[in-house]
Amino acid sequence: NDPNNLVEGRYVCIRRANDLSQETGFIPSPQVGTHTDEKYGSHHAKDSAALFHTLGMDLNLFSSAMKVNSQYMHILWFNLQVKEPTSITSIKERLYSNERVAMTTKDLTSSVFSFGRDHGHFGRILNQTVVVEQTLNVKNDHEITGFCFTPQDGNSILSSISAAEWLLYPHSYIDKIQCLSHLFF
């Protein structure tokens, strides 16, 4: 739980080309992005670092991005180096206990998207991320690697509801949003 435990975080954002409802912007093949920031790479790490900076944390992050010709979900490959030794069992326990994280053994974005459509609140997965369990790896007790999917719509819906509740009820917003907890997977 110590934010100082993170030595560095590297990740690749594999973005969907466009949303299912969009009629334009689809690409015919994978397209790589550029590193627009020398320190952070793509804007994703820069945005993440800025967010964590509001909490007083100065994280060593770097990201790359690319788009693929899919309309389902973004995919994130991550590699985290930590100071304290850890294990795959410990990582899985922490992820399973985090209500904002969904765990799956499905390895296709279409399967996870379909699950959300069939079982989610109005077809949406409200969790912030869906980690693919069998992709998790711990190397030398200090390096954590894996893949996760981003349920784009549900992610922003929950964030927006949380932000509105925080604005209205800054001391009790966490209690207020618990009415949605049964919708997390």
Question: What do these predicted regions represent?
Answer:
Residues 1-23, 163-167, 171-184:
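N-terminal Rossmann-like NAD(P) cofactor-binding subdomain of oxidoreductases
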Residues 5-148, 152:
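C-terminal substrate-binding/catalytic lobe of Rossmann-fold NAD(P)-dependent oxidoreductases
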Residues 90-94, 159-162, 179:
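Composition- and surface-driven signal marking solvent-exposed, interaction-prone regions
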Residues 145, 149-157, 161-164, 168-175:
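Long, low-complexity C-terminal extensions of enzymes
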